Each structure stands twice: as C-alpha cells, then as structure tokens.
Regions:
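Nucleotide/phosphate-binding catalytic cleft detector across ATP-hydrolyzing
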Residues: 1-20, 26-210, 228-230, 239, ...
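Short beta-strand scaffold segments in enzyme catalytic cores
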Residues: 23-27, 220-223
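Glycine-rich phosphate-binding loop of actin/hexokinase-like ATP-binding domains
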Residues: 207-245
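Long, well-ordered mid-to-C-terminal structural blocks that present hydrophobic/aromatic surfaces
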Residues: 247-251
Length: 285
C-alpha cells in the first residue's frame, strides 16, 4: 500500500478509489512497527460520477457514504479522514527549476532547506491546485545529477521540481462530497500515478516507463523517467465504451456484451486475429 506523508499517522484513515462503475474504500492504520495494517474494505456501485468527475453531488455523496460506512462496519472502526484516488481533475504535470546562491561557497543544511521551501510560490496552470510536489536531482553550477549536495562547494545550487496539479473545481467538489459524509478530505491522488508506485520497480521508474490504467469510463496514463513523474493524464474513454460498441454492433444487451468482452476480448494481437474469429449466437427473438 502506498502511503503519502498526509497519511503518515497512527490514526485510522480511509482511501477511496473512485471509478466510473464502482467505488472502493480501504481502511488502514500505521502500526507501531511502521507497517500499514488493512483493517477493512468495501465496494459499492458508483453513482453521480462519470469519467472521473462528479455529475450529481447528492447521488455521489450518498454512494460515498454507503461505501465508507460498509468499510467501517467491516473494520469495526470509525474514521474521520479520507484520501481520494481518482482519474479525474484534468491532471497536469509542470516542471520548475529553482536556483539559489551559495554565500559561503559550502552548501549547508540551511541551503538545502532554503531551496526545498522555495517552490511554494511556483506557478501552476490557471485554475489548478497542487496535489503532489516531487523534487528531483540537484545541479551545482555546471555539475548535474547530484543526489546530496551537503558539504559540497559551489556558487549556485539548482533543484528541479515536478508538480502534479488538478482542477481546483474538481478538488473543491470532491472535498464538498466527503464533507457531506462528515469526513475530512486528507489528499487527492491521480489513479495512474498511484498505480505506478504500486506496480513499477525503482528500475522501471528510472529507465522510463509508460503505465496505462484502463478503467471503465476513463483511461489514465502516467510516465516516469529518471525516477521522476514526467506526465500524467486521463482520456475519457474506457472499457464501457468497448462494451457499448460490441452491444451496438451485435444488437445485444450491455450485460451480454460485457460478458462477451470479458470471455473473448484481448488487447494482444498474438492471441486474437482475423484467422480466428469469435462466433456469437444471438438468442433473442
């Protein structure tokens, strides 16, 4: 389980994964040994949300409340804070390089703290709010790829930041929805970025990897390279679009099309081809 700094607490907390077809809630707690203990979980049909965005506040907040309540019953515990994972919010990754002068030529801890806090006023896309800020490697004068410049000599120290931001409107609406469930919004995370942390190795993120999270109503993507998040985005098409296309082409119900897709469908061309067509008998009158 990936836990952000805002989740680093001894109190139980919830993680709500918002999909187009279902909501999933996990309740966890950090143990005295610094492990993450899973206490409870629950799923519920998604309502009032489409393609990662809230379309009906009342229906969505009700569905969230039912999902969290079921997870609380499963865990036999009550939570006050929830962290959201969603493909929505029109995510954007921006990169900034911050540079400071080194007055005494030797880099101190104060210099490192100074450059780390210098990113608080960096610009974001219009109408966006920052949800993640990741520092990269340092540069000291013309020397690049420095992991820890403490004690080194130089005149200027630079540090690149990768910032992930989402629409302020989406953020505010998610916060409003959980507040209606008497919960506090701890943080919001992009689904593909969280999938990268869960699925990719350190080598994957260092060498360069594109991860595609194919959901029901959206397809989320994230790119890591040299250990840094380079891109995150969401396409408002997913598995439900494929299901509807099958239903239209074969004149069958959505449930029949979903079953056919699950049994016969494949994204690998080596498994299916024109030489091995799928047969389907239409049984309805």
């Amino acid at each position: 389980m990936i836990v952000s700094s805002k989740m680093a607490t001894r109190s139980p907390f919830g993680i709500l994964d918002i999909g187009s077809s279902k909501l999933a809630c996990l309740i966890a707690q950090r143990s005295s040994a610094n492990d993450i203990l899973l206490l409870g979980q629950a799923m519920h049909a998604a309502e009032g949300v489409k393609q990662g965005e809230i379309t009906d506040m009342n229906k969505f907040s009700t569905a969230v409340g039912k999902t969290v309540s079921a997870a609380e019953r499963n865990a036999d515990i009550t939570i006050s804070t929830i962290h959201i994972v969603t493909p929505g919010g029109n995510p954007a990754v921006t990169k900034h390089v911050q540079t400071i002068d080194i007055h005494n030529q030797v880099i101190s801890r104060r210099d490192i703290q100074r450059i780390a806090h210098a990113n608080s006023h960096l610009k974001l896309p219009v109408g966006h709010v920052r949800i993640q800020n990741q520092p990269g490697l340092y540069q000291l004068d013309d020397q690049r790829q420095i992991e820890n410049p403490l004690g080194m000599c130089g005149r200027q120290l630079s540090l690149q930041f990768s910032q992930l931001s989402v629409s302020q409107t989406s953020y505010a609406n998610f916060a409003q929805a959980v507040q209606q469930c008497h919960l506090e919004l701890g943080s919001i995370h992009h689904s593909a970025v969280m999938a990268c942390h869960a699925c990719l190795t350190e080598d994957d993120r260092e060498l360069g990897t594109l991860l595609i999270d194919f959901g029901g109503g959206t397809t989320s993507v994230a790119i890591f390279s040299e250990g840094q998040l380079r891109f995150a985005g969401t396409i408002r098409m997913g598995g439900l679009n494929v299901t509807r296309d099958i239903a239209r082409m074969l004149s069958i119900t959505i449930s029949e099309a979903e079953r056919l897709k699950a049994i016969e469908g494949s994204v690998l061309p080596t498994i299916t081809s024109a030489e091995n067509p799928v047969s389907y008998t239409h049984l309805r009158a």
